[in-house]
């Protein structure tokens, strides 16, 4: 209920009532900072979960002292024996794969990137680039851990990709094996293929085939996103080039003087350079948030959100013409209705000046 009340706060324009200490408000700064801290833990889980599965020496081993209260029994049921071997086996059997279920938490990171991309305080370009970089690094790390997992779970170590090149690699450090796995993973992802490391058994060959298929999809995704970002960033440049070309062709076709051509080019360049600044100035001149709707109603522009109600209300939708026909006979009610749209004394003068500026711009563009 707290989340719904906070979501409706911006629509009604008033803050929700104070909540109790036992209610978690998702819009408080403390909750947001805690959520950001959880994102850091999610990133650590994304790195540690595959790494602990592939390298047993990297996982921390806790000391647990157990004193059995009963006697040692001989289990003869097949289901009990199977369950015991799954839980207490050398590599914990299938239970080790359940550690990868923590990767489901990555959806929180995906939601974070989706929220940051919509935030105007952050650059959309750098946000997308960081997201693509994180996806690439996670793919490299996950593939390297799978390669290591296949090596340590294969019976004949000499018939693995690292055992055929480096003898007694099990005695080497954890980071040495991980570095070799990342090296092979990144050479496979980059389609370099030096040939020093290669698959030597059927399992490694099958995984290499699946990894290359995933590599083609990931490469297409990255290239498509980067192309979209480059086109988005260079769209204004291409518009300016088209404008310069159009002005040059227009001047040559109509045999305009060189001075007039330079003035037209300078005017166009000034418009593109000050486009962002003029947009900010236009927003400042509009003033309060409700004035936008008032201007739209005065110019008979349909508004998508015209009514907001806090209680059960019956709303009748009529056109601008029918409203004038209903208000004109009742002068007192008409003054009250239209006074809601005109909040300042200079508003009518501002609309008249806006109309004059619109006519001047239309005349200049029609003359050109």
Curated annotation (Swiss-Prot):
InterPro entries reported for this sequence: cNMP-bd_dom, cNMP-bd_dom_sf, Ion_trans_dom, KAT/AKT
Organism this protein belongs to: Oryza sativa subsp. japonica (Rice)
Keywords: Ion channel, Ion transport, Membrane, Potassium, Potassium channel, Potassium transport, Transmembrane, Transmembrane helix, Transport, Voltage-gated channel
Function: Putative inward-rectifying potassium channel.
Pfam families linked: Ion_trans
Protein name (record): Putative potassium channel KAT5
Main location as per UniProt: membrane
PANTHER family per record: POTASSIUM CHANNEL AKT1, POTASSIUM CHANNEL KAT3
């Amino acid at each position: 209920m707290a989340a719904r009340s906070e979501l409706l706060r911006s629509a009604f324009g008033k803050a929700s009532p104070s909540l109790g200490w036992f209610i978690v408000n998702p819009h408080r700064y403390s909750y947001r900072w805690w959520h950001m801290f959880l994102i850091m833990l999610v990133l650590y889980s994304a790195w540690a979960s595959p790494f602990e599965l592939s390298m047993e020496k990297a996982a921390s081993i806790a000391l647990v002292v157990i004193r059995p209260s009963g006697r040692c029994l001989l289990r003869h049921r097949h289901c009990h024996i199977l369950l015991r071997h799954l839980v207490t086996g050398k590599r914990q059997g299938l239970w080790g794969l359940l550690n990868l279920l923590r990767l489901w938490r990555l959806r929180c990171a995906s939601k974070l990137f989706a929220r940051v991309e919509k935030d105007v305080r952050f650059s959309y370009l750098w946000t997308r680039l960081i997201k693509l970089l994180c996806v690439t690094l996670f793919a490299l790390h996950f593939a390297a851990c799978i390669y290591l997992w296949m090596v340590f779970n294969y019976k004949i170590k000499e018939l693995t990709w690292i055992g055929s090149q480096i003898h007694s690699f099990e005695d080497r450090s954890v980071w040495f094996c991980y570095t070799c796995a990342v090296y092979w993973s990144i050479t496979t992802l980059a389609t370099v293929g030096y040939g020093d490391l290669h698959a030597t058994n059927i399992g490694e060959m099958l995984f290499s085939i699946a990894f290359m298929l995933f590599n083609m999809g990931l490469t297409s995704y990255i290239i498509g996103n980067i192309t979209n970002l480059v086109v988005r960033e260079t769209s204004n440049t291409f518009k300016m080039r088209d404008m310069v070309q159009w002005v040059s062709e227009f001047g040559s076709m109509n045999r305009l003087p060189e001075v007039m051509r330079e003035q037209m080019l300078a005017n166009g360049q000034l418009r593109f350079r000050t486009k962002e600044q003029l947009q900010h100035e236009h927003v400042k001149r509009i003033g309060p948030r409700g004035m936008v709707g008032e201007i739209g109603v005065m110019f008979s522009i349909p508004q998508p959100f015209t009514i907001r109600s806090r209680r059960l209300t019956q709303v009748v939708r009529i056109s601008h013409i029918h409203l004038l026909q209903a208000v004109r006979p009742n002068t007192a009610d008409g003054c009250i209705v239209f006074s809601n749209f005109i909040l300042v004394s200079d508003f009518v003068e501002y609309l008249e000046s806006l109309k004059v500026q619109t006519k001047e711009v239309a005349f200049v563009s029609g003359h050109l």
